[in-house]
């Protein structure tokens, strides 16, 4: 297929297929970790993935891009810039100075929490598209949605580069559209 | 001054002055924390700061943008995209799957480390501009430079949004140009 005929998503899928680094047994035995660092470090691949994710976020009527700490920052920031939007940094607990709004969530072992500043930013009534690199269990993304809704923001959808099948991730995301750049594996 | 006459840096400085959130005694007593989350969450301010940092990175002949985990990702990713470059995610210890290259550095209390993948990315001979939100002690940025040089990359300079004066940050950065968007306070 000629370069022009390739859609934005095709180019992004090619980049992900070519540059993703696969590492067995990380962070624990039995997990195949998909490291996108080489995708982002390569100009052509990085631009291709950002372009596809921006196209998806625009379809979801994004007014602000929500980036998940920390790998979601690496994609969400560029997508926000391309669309001329702000990027909402959804931080892990303790990273932001008080006062903050906090949303706890269950992990496989124990709990974690996400936070937003409770001053200086007003997301009430805004359409927020949440961006991260991978949809796995969906726990973090689900918590991010609750956090945003607790600040009267509206999550109009999720855009991810890749998805790990079989972990029930989409069940945690509620009735919002989920767009994943790479085809399910 | 009319909108057109304002330089890229003037617009960015206005955005930082207007939107930065100041919080006393965070992360510890006596520290005035400057939270840029509201700057990034506002479309106009975010674009203004990214444009200024991209202008600076271009002056420093960037071939790749190095973003420091995690707030450096929020700026470095957009700057890289604007310049059509890749973004090198310089991660905190343990976040990347092996094999990795590690650079330890001293903290006020204890040590920390930064890591890069030792496969899948080739930065040998490349001009890398390091981007973070704040220049404080310069410890993390100095370690990032050593890490990149250990992979035969070349740090052609640093671009920061703001600088905390009086912490000797520049002493840690070696003989490379440092561009800070906001005027020294």
UniProtKB/Swiss-Prot annotation, chains A, B:
Query: What Pfam families does the record point to?
Result: Pribosyltran
Q: Name one GO cellular component term.
A: cytoplasm
Keywords attached to this Swiss-Prot or TrEMBL record, sorted alphabetically, are: Cytoplasm, Glycosyltransferase, Purine salvage, Transferase
Q: Spell out the subcellular localization from the entry.
A: Cytoplasm
Q: SUPFAM superfamilies per the record?
A: PRTase-like
What family does this belong to?
Belongs to the purine/pyrimidine phosphoribosyltransferase family.
Top-level EC class: transferase
- Keyword flag Glycosyltransferase: yes
**Subunit annotation:** Homodimer.
UniProt catalytic activity = AMP + diphosphate = 5-phospho-alpha-D-ribose 1-diphosphate + adenine
One GO MF term on file is: adenine binding
Sorted alphabetically, the Gene Ontology BP terms of this entry are: adenine salvage; AMP salvage; purine ribonucleoside salvage
- Top-rank taxon of the source lineage equals Bacteria
Query: Is-annotated flag, keyword NAD?
Result: no
Name it. Answer: Adenine phosphoribosyltransferase
Pathway(s) of this molecule: Purine metabolism; AMP biosynthesis via salvage pathway; AMP from adenine: step 1/1
């Amino acid at each position: 297929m000629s370069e022009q005929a390739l859609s934005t998503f095709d180019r992004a899928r090619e980049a992900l297929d070519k540059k993703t680094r696969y590492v067995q047994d990380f962070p624990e035995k039995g997990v195949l970790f998909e490291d996108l660092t080489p995708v982002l470090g390569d100009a052509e691949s990085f631009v291709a993935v950002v372009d596809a994710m921006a196209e998806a976020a625009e379809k979801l009527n994004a007014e602000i891009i929500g980036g998940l700490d920390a790998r979601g920052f690496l994609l969400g920031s560029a997508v926000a810039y391309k669309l001329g939007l702000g990027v909402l940094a959804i931080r892990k607990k303790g990273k932001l100075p008080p006062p903050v709004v906090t949303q706890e969530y269950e992990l496989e072992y124990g709990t974690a929490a996400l936070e937003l500043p409770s001053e200086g930013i007003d997301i009430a009534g805004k359409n927020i598209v949440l961006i991260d690199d991978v949809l796995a269990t969906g726990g973090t993304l689900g918590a991010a949605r609750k956090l945003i809704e607790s600040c009267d923001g509206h999550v109009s959808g999720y855009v991810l580069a890749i998805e790990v099948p079989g972990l029930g991730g989409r069940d945690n995301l509620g009735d919002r559209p989920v767009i994943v750049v790479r085809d399910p594996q």
